[in-house]
């Protein structure tokens, strides 16, 4: 008798939880549909999920985080910070969204450079006409015991594509790349060979790489921009 009563109560709780879950899922879909309608076709809403603040929802547009209310009346751009701990919840969430699997990268599509024992690994997405990429490359010359994979993505201008082809198709792609990025020696040659540029561009689109330089470490973390060498070394140290 007691067992039957317990099972009956458990069944009621399970049904209640299921119904609550269904209601939450339905609410999220309604908010997503309303936000998508208001933003139009130029912005793709990937997902809408409850935010850690009561009454707010996280809206993921592309790889960018926004927030909205339950009626999808407002779109909020900003960061949520937990006052008790000082933790930037939005920043942490953004880092998780931007993370990739290192194994998803294709080394054959990159210019590979090994220094010292090559034990530390770094992937860099670069455009040959990117000023910040040139600044980064000068800093990266200070690194040792590292393997750097440089993925060329010509996103800045038509000339970027031509330079990328000339670099990739040269007899020594890494030397040609560094000669241009660090020493200012313009690549020569016709650049007529099979290149991985289209594959690199497709990868960039899939993973939301919209600017150069963009760096990735073996834990999948993403660092955009001309990162300071001290920050790169600090990140390497954290991976040990």
Task: Describe every region a protein language model picked out.
Residues 2-9, 15-165, 179-182, 186-212, ...:
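Extracytoplasmic thiol/disulfide redox context detector
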Residues 62, 218-219:
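Short strand-coil-strand connectors
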Residues 157, 220-221:
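Short secondary-structure capping/turn micro-motifs that flank functional sites
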Residues 167-169:
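Conserved NTP-binding/hydrolysis module of P-loop NTPases
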Residues 171-178:
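Conserved, helical-rich catalytic subdomain that frames metal- and/or nucleotide-binding sites
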Residues 224-225:
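Short, exposed beta-strand-loop hairpins at the edges of beta-sheets
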């Amino acid at each position: 008798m007691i067992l039957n009563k317990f099972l009956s109560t458990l069944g009621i709780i399970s049904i209640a939880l299921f119904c609550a879950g269904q209601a939450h899922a339905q609410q999220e879909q309604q908010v997503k549909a309303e936000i998508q309608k208001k933003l139009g076709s130029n912005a793709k809403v990937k997902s809408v999920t409850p935010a850690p603040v009561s009454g707010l929802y996280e809206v993921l547009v592309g790889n960018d985080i926004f927030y909205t209310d339950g009626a999808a009346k407002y779109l909020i751009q900003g960061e949520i910070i937990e006052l008790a701990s000082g933790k930037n919840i939005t920043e942490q969430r953004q880092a998780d969204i931007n993370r990739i699997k290192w194994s998803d990268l294709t080394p054959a599509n990159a210019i590979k450079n090994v220094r010292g024992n090559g034990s530390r690994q770094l992937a860099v997405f670069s455009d040959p006409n990117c000023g910040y990429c040139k600044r980064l490359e000068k800093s990266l010359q200070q690194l040792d015991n590292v393997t750097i994979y440089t993925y060329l993505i010509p996103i800045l201008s038509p000339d970027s594509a031509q330079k990328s082809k000339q670099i990739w198709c040269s007899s020594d792609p890494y030397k040609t790349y560094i000669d241009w990025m660090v020493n200012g020696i313009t690549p020569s040659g016709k650049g007529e060979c099979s290149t991985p540029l289209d594959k690199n561009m497709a990868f960039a689109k899939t993973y939301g790489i919209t600017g150069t330089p963009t760096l990735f470490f073996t834990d999948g973390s993403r660092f955009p921009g001309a990162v300071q060498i001290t920050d790169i070394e600090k990140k390497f140290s954290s991976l040990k």
